């Protein structure tokens, strides 16, 4: 769609999708409970999983399948909500969250080459479903060239087909409350999938089929409106963090200088904006853009970046970790410090692959996909979906680690102003064990929550506060 005001939620609901949804709804009536072939009970260097856990594939087409991990709630899996999680990118693996942010175990987080049990996993009071999306990301399968090119709409269409395949495997969770969640570029994925579920339910209601028990979504530090998010909000953010001199921000504001995520739009302002933009990025190039107050990782050599593993007697290669320059392609002068090389080695280990039921023909696991894939950004982003889902009565939450330089809180507050929804409960602190963990402002239709003193990966860097906050919210409790 080219016009975000066009009611195009009918346009994309084509016959192919309708047939797929109808078939899936029918199949759901004739399936067995949780697939034994997908269950795993332990991973290397960990103790046994404390709840039932599964890893396998969700078919989308004959040539595409999305890898998932599902871990049941420790509390009441028969009634607790199911929460879907996506990482962003676009093109980064949700195993990053499973192994470092909100899963049962923590592997190699923050430069520490250790494995330990997460004391605050999200599955304490919810069943968690991590999906590697789009096809080709991580251990998800994309078998031909066409499968390796996608966009926001196609990704969401694939995701709902995969979700139906998941319900096929786990029909006993059909009645549990369902929430969709994610961070970063999943600020696009999450509203889009929720909107697809909304459409699925409209059709189900018209045809007498059972609808999904969707309740709402949660987005963390997510891209939502390209007029404000990522690059457009970076200058004001680094000025407010005292990282650049006043003359730079004054020049930008006086000359209407605006740059956009991955340069997919032409920047505004005169050519004289360019050297000032470069100077801003140079001054911040040595920082951790994902948490402006957090240290960067130690450098490693190019040779150390190439990982090798043996799978079924054959050598597979993979990229060890990601540099900030690779992870932040819009940052012209970002540093080459590499994070998560330990995690890359762990996930690519043959024993780990076997435990997760990864087929031997699947390639090595990379944190984010490479140049053989293409993702075509759509100009609309996802803010247009918010009023639709508000009208449907869904709960919406946006939380933001307030030291993020990649998708800054400043940009989020600007598009929230653009929504122009009335405030129901004024800005106030929320606490964890008597300490301020951030602030919350409740709009008519959306809860906006900041997480104090952490950046882009708030569930990783503020484990207890974010887990407590998310748990309370999905269970309808105050925090």
Question: How should each PLM-predicted stretch be described?
Answer:
Residues 11-14, 28:
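Repetitive helical segments and hydrophobic/amphipathic motifs
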Residues 5, 14-19:
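Intrinsically disordered, low-complexity polyampholyte segments enriched for Lys and acidic residues
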Residues 1-11:
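A short, hydrophobic C-terminal helix/tail in secreted or cell-surface proteins
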Residues 18-479:
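Terminal and linker regions of secretory-pathway proteins
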């Amino acid at each position: 769609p080219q016009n975000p005001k066009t009611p195009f939620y009918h346009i994309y609901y084509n016959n192919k999708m309708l047939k797929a949804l109808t078939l899936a709804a029918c199949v759901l009536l004739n399936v067995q409970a949780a697939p034994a072939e997908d269950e795993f009970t332990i991973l290397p260097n960990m103790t046994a999983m404390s709840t039932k856990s599964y890893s396998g594939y969700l078919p989308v087409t004959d040539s595409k399948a999305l890898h998932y991990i599902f871990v049941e709630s420790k509390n009441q899996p028969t009634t607790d909500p199911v929460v879907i999680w996506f990482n962003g990118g676009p093109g980064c693996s949700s195993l990053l969250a499973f192994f470092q942010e909100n899963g049962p175990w923590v592997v190699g987080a923050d430069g520490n080459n250790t494995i330990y049990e997460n004391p605050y996993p999200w599955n304490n009071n919810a069943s968690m479903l991590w999906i590697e999306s789009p096809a080709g990301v991580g251990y998800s399968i994309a078998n031909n060239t066409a499968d390796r090119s996608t966009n926001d709409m196609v990704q969401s269409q694939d995701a709902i087909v995969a979700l139906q395949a998941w319900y096929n495997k786990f029909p006993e969770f059909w009645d549990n409350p369902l929430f969709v969640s994610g961070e970063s570029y999943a600020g696009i994925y999450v509203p889009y999938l929720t909107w697809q579920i909304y459409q699925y339910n409209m059709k189900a209601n018209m045809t007498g089929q059972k609808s999904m028990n969707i309740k709402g979504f949660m987005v963390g530090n997510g891209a939502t409106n390209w007029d404000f998010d990522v690059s457009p909000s970076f200058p004001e953010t680094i000025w407010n963090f005292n990282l650049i001199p006043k003359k730079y921000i004054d020049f930008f504001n006086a000359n209407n200088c605006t740059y956009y995520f991955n340069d997919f739009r032409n920047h505004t302002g005169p050519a004289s904006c360019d050297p000032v933009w470069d100077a801003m990025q140079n001054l911040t190039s040595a920082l951790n853009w994902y948490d402006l107050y957090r240290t960067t990782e130690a450098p490693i050599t190019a040779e150390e970046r190439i990982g090798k593993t043996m799978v079924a007697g054959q050598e597979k290669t993979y990229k060890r970790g990601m540099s900030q320059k690779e992870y932040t392609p819009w940052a012209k002068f970002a540093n080459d410090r590499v994070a998560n090389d330990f995690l890359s080695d762990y996930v690519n280990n043959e024993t780990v692959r076997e435990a997760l039921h990864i087929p031997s023909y699947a390639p090595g696991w990379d944190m984010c996909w490479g140049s053989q894939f293409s993702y075509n950004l759509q100009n609309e982003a996802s803010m247009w979906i918010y009023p639709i889902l508000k009208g449907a009565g869904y709960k919406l939450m946006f939380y933001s680690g307030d030291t993020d330089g990649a998708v800054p809180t400043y940009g989020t507050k600007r598009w929230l102003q653009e929504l122009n929804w009335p405030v129901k409960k004024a800005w106030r602190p929320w606490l964890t064990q008597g300490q301020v963990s951030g602030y919350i402002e409740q709009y008519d239709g959306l809860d906006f929550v900041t997480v104090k003193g952490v950046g882009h990966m708030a569930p990783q860097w503020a484990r207890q506060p974010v887990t407590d906050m998310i748990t309370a919210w999905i269970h309808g409790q105050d925090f």
